[in-house]
């Protein structure tokens, strides 16, 4: 545990309501046979020093915990040509095994390439208040899903999931005024080490409604628009093929296209493209020689966008039909 301030030493005095800033870290190696890993409150609060502090504080009085953010990071250890999917979900921690994961308690669901890094930063808008004498139950769970990836016993890890939880803790007094915290939009970041135009799928519950990660507002799409679409036009690439091609194109493909269009008149301020035929042939080859499992990604994205804007989604979809 890092970031425990010296103020924590004063928590034993009931008349002191100063807060202690804390950061708790947990990591776990992920293997193909672990299709669903739940990282619960025991992992996040399991560090000995913090547990002693919490237990001591709850014996004296009620405790107020303000969680500023939870950061979840996927660190891959596999080769880029290994077509596998990583899924990360943040949801409420139910206390019965019969709860349906695909319900109102799910906040974020993300699916991406297992060979690329993935990071979610989530800011809970709620405050945790624990009554004197109670045990501390952490109300959120992070689920990690490796899909259908299989490994033999003794195989190396596919990657590692890392979680940081940042919060402040202080004694709770009825007379203390606690101001409600406005919602902060979560952020999703990902790696483009081997696939420069790739964008993961994500569905996010906001204060009003459920929204998808908008591929067409990302830097990756802006690059694809500049490098490819401006030169070949939308007649050469079907709208449903844009997302599959973006997910497929490698760094080598990007460098080859940039090499072929570097003398294009458009790049020198001209009014028309002078390399269209060359770039069209390259894109056609890329579109033919790629993994076909991406074929429906464009249509699926359109469906998720339509479902969100029409209000059809009342729960966060688990993106079970997305695979890499």
From Swiss-Prot:
An annotated Gene Ontology molecular function: RNA binding
Gene Ontology biological process terms in this record: transport of virus in host, cell to cell
Keyword RNA-binding appears in the UniProt entry: yes
Subcellular location: Host cell junction, Host plasmodesma
Principal cellular location given in the protein's record: host cell
Protein origin, superkingdom: Viruses
Sorted UniProt keywords: Host cell junction, Host-virus interaction, RNA-binding, Transport, Viral movement protein
Cellular component annotations (GO), alphabetically ordered: host cell plasmodesma
Chain residue ranges for the region called Disordered: 1-20
Role, per record: Transports viral genome to neighboring plant cells directly through plasmosdesmata, without any budding. The movement protein allows efficient cell to cell propagation, by bypassing the host cell wall barrier.
Quaternary structure and interacting proteins, as annotated: Interacts with nucleoprotein.
Name listed for the protein in its UniProt record: Movement protein
Protein's gene: sc4
């Amino acid at each position: 545990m890092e970031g425990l301030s010296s103020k924590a030493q004063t928590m034993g005095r009931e008349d002191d309501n100063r807060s202690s800033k804390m950061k708790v870290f947990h990591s776990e190696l992920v293997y193909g046979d672990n299709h669903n890993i739940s990282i619960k409150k025991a992992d996040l609060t399991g560090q000995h020093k913090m547990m002693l502090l919490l237990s001591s504080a709850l014996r004296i009085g009620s405790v107020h915990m303000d969680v500023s953010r939870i950061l979840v990071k996927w660190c891959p250890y596999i080769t880029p040509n290994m077509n596998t999917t990583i899924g990360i979900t943040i949801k409420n921690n139910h206390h019965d095994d019969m709860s349906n994961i695909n319900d109102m308690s799910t906040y974020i669901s993300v699916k991406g390439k297992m060979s690329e890094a993935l990071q979610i930063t989530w800011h809970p808008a709620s405050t945790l208040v624990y009554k004197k004498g109670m045990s501390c139950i952490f109300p959120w769970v992070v689920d990690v899903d490796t899909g259908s990836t299989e490994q033999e016993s003794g195989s190396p890890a596919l990657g590692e999931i890392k979680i940081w939880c940042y919060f402040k803790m202080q004694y709770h007094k009825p007379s203390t005024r606690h101001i409600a915290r406005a919602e902060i939009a979560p952020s999703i970041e990902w790696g483009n080490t081997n696939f420069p135009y790739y964008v993961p799928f994500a569905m996010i519950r906001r204060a009003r409604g459920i929204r998808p990660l908008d591929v067409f507002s990302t830097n990756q799409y802006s690059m694809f628009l500049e490098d490819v679409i401006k030169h070949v036009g939308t007649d050469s690439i079907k709208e449903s093929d844009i997302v599959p091609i973006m997910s497929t194109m490698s760094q080598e493909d990007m460098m080859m296209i940039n090499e072929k269009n570097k003398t294009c008149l458009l790049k020198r301020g001209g009014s028309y493209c002078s390399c269209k035929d060359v770039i069209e042939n390259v894109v056609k080859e890329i579109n033919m020689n790629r993994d076909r499992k991406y074929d429906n990604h464009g249509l699926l994205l359109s469906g998720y966008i339509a479902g969100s804007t029409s209000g059809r989604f009342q729960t966060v979809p688990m993106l079970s039909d997305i695979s890499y």
